[in-house]
Curated annotation (Swiss-Prot):
Protein name from the UniProt record: Uncharacterized protein R814
Top-level division of the source organism's lineage: Viruses
Taxonomic lineage from the root: Viruses, Varidnaviria, Bamfordvirae, Nucleocytoviricota, Megaviricetes
Length: 305
């Protein structure tokens, strides 16, 4: 029986390290092709190999298995929930960088569920606070909760007060990010809900690609923001809200030629709001309107003084 176990463990290890013509192991290929079924099969084989090795007290003549825990970040970010659970059961050494990579790169509808599982892992629980202090946890939860207020509040009970940072607000004003069903109106309702339920940080707004004028109008007319803007010249650039009174870089040129008529109309409204508040001058706005009209086939040029 012992000889059979030795032969089986050796076969499992050899197969795990058997590379294809590109030098890729079976596990590496399964990860690359997002084949969760094959990943799970290999994880089961690794577990079997490990149990045999423990039973045999790790004989030196049996090679190492292509260790799945080395690929924790790659598996964690894109895997199905069942696969993620299996990799956690192998007790990988999870570093701060692993956590950060996961939170930045996780994709799919199960990221909140996987984050919950990750947070409960013994080697992780004490490390989450590090990222919460830098808003990473808050941003992650808000992003993957799709601004579901109740879901965010449930996580807030566990992680403490969650601050809505500027990245999330920029999402609500920017191009193409219509979280709640494809409209600026829904984005407007979302930002009102966020204001009513959480602390919102407006310290690094980027409205240069504004395409939801109602959201911009809501933000720019807030009393505390107006006070900061009024003190613009006396504040350190690293501390103030980044609004330029001469808004020469309102949009990069590549954005001036793209977008539907509806999006261009929203940009026009954003310009009007900025003009009204003194954050763009007539020359800047006329140049932007010129490029928008050029996109629509009109030929008159910008006002130049």
């Amino acid at each position: 029986m012992r000889q059979f176990k030795r032969a089986y463990a050796k076969s499992l290890a050899d197969n795990s390290n058997d590379t294809n013509s590109n030098g890729v192991t079976p596990l590496q290929y399964a990860i690359k092709t997002h084949n969760d079924y094959k990943i799970r099969k290999i994880l089961k084989k690794y577990k079997t190999w490990k149990n045999i090795m423990e039973d045999l007290q790790y004989p030196l003549d049996i090679p190492e298995f292509d260790d799945p825990t080395k690929y924790f970040t790659e598996i964690a970010s894109n895997s199905e929930t069942e696969t993620f659970k299996m990799i956690l059961e192998l007790d990988p050494e999870i570093t701060d960088d692993n956590i950060k990579h996961f939170m930045i790169n996780c994709r799919g509808n199960n990221c909140m569920e996987k984050f919950d599982m990750l947070h409960k892992h013994p080697s992780v629980k004490d490390k989450i606070g590090l990222f919460n202090s830098r808003n990473n946890v808050g941003s992650y939860i808000i992003f993957h909760a799709r601004f579901d207020i109740d879901k965010i509040k449930n996580f807030e009970k566990r992680f403490g007060k969650i601050k809505i940072d500027n990245e999330m607000i920029n999402v609500l004003t920017g191009p193409g990010y219509y979280w709640g069903g494809g409209s600026c109106q829904k984005n407007f309702e979302i930002i009102q809900d966020l204001e009513n339920n959480f602390e919102v940080d407006y310290s690094r707004l980027n409205i240069g690609e504004c395409e939801c004028s109602n959201v911009l109008d809501f933000i720019i007319n807030r009393r505390d923001i107006s006070e900061i803007i009024d003190q613009d010249n006396s504040r350190n650039p690293t501390d103030r809200i980044i609004f330029k009174k001469k808004y020469d870089l309102l949009w990069e040129e590549k954005h001036r030629y793209t977008g539907s008529k509806k999006r261009i109309k929203e940009r026009e409204k954003c310009i009007d709001i900025l003009l009204d508040k003194g954050f763009a001058d007539a020359k800047t706005s006329s140049v932007i309107r010129y490029y928008n009209n050029l996109h629509n086939g009109y030929q008159y040029g910008p006002y130049m003084d």
